Amino acid sequence: MQAVDNLTSAPGNTSLCTRDYKITQVLFPLLYTVLFFVGLITNGLAMRIFFQIRSKSNFIIFLKNTVISDLLMILTFPFKILSDAKLGTGPLRTFVCQVTSVIFYFTMYISISFLGLITIDRYQKTTRPFKTSNPKNLLGAKILSVVIWAFMFLLSLPNMILTNRQPRDKNVKKCSFLKSEFGLVWHEIVNYICQVIFWINFLIVIVCYTLITKELYRSYVRTRGVGKVPRKKVNVKVFIIIAVFFICFVPFHFARIPYTLSQTRDVFDCTAENTLFYVKESTLWLTSLNACLDPFIYFFLCKSFRNSLISMLKCPNSATSLSQDNRKKEQDGGDPNEETPM
């Protein structure tokens, strides 16, 4: 989505405004390398477990889409690492601008969208804890998931196609140099749309968690003195979603506003431009951290995922049998895919 940012230099006095290569070519590639290995292991394990869990609720459907999105994002990290570390050739940098950078932002906003849907689902679970999903609701969740993927794909595809200019030299410093005139216009349009996507989901998270907090407080007042400590612990787990959302996505979208201004208007001096660049890259790394934090959501909020993971760690060959046990419980009327009612 924001391919222009990844390999960019600031406008204006670009040749005079240099950056610390130890940060741009060493530190950030090392940080992304850590994320790559941690994310590949945790999300690969999550994918294996989710293949064994039936989609018996909207919650599970949204989680499965999230893990797919996270894995796609993680697979773009090696290209960014090589490009940022200046270890790649000209064709690699062109490939990053044209493909992997676009996929990175494509998956970021898919993850944001599904976190918003998961938040709505958790609010419904809080207010109506014993409501079960019916086939019609499940079909609606699947259709909505397909619509999100299709919409983001249609937004992203032109960014790939319209990055079609031949580089003037081997070292492509700005992805915008490779975009056609309409490609630059489309890129700007997509940026605005993605901003809208974020702020809509930001409002969803704020509103839903305000209502969830009120509902949990009412529940606490009603049961005060009864001593239901285990239940209180379960209630707290739901707040992991808002924690992940604010840690990973909020800083980047606030930092992005002044950074974009520094890229489009010559209103900052060199020191300010570099500071904004480092802040943008740091917060962009936090958005990538989401791929490593999402498995905590799966573990704490999805009982069948947690049970399967614990069983797999204790005995790798028992995961399949546990999946069969889960399906048997579902046939008997239980739903092991949901957390204990809040």
Swiss-Prot record:
Pfam families documented for this protein: 7tm_1
Extracellular face of the membrane: 1-27, 83-97, 163-185, 260-278
GO cellular component, one term: cell surface
A biological process term (GO) from this entry: substrate-dependent cell migration, cell extension
Region feature (Disordered): 319-342
Subcellular location per the Swiss-Prot or TrEMBL entry: Cell membrane
Stretches with biased composition (Acidic residues): 333-342
Binding site for ADP: 93, 97, 105, 156-159, 175-179, 187, 191, 256-259, 263, 280
Transmembrane segments: 28-50, 62-82, 98-118, 143-162, 186-207, 234-259, 279-298
Main localization (coarse): membrane
Disulphide linkage map: C17-C270, C97-C175
Protein topology in the membrane: Multi-pass membrane protein
Domain free text: The transmembrane domain is composed of seven transmembrane helices; most of these are not strictly perpendicular to the plane of the membrane, but are tilted and/or kinked. Agonist binding promotes a conformation change in the extracellular loops that leads to an inward movement of the transmembrane helices. Antagonists such as AZD1283 can bind to an overlapping site, but block the inward movement of the transmembrane helices.
Disease tied to this entry: Bleeding disorder, platelet-type, 8: A condition characterized by mild to moderate mucocutaneous bleeding, and excessive bleeding after surgery or trauma. The defect is due to severe impairment of platelet response to ADP resulting in defective platelet aggregation.
Protein family according to the UniProt entry: Belongs to the G-protein coupled receptor 1 family.
Name the record gives this protein: P2Y purinoceptor 12
Organism: Homo sapiens (Human)
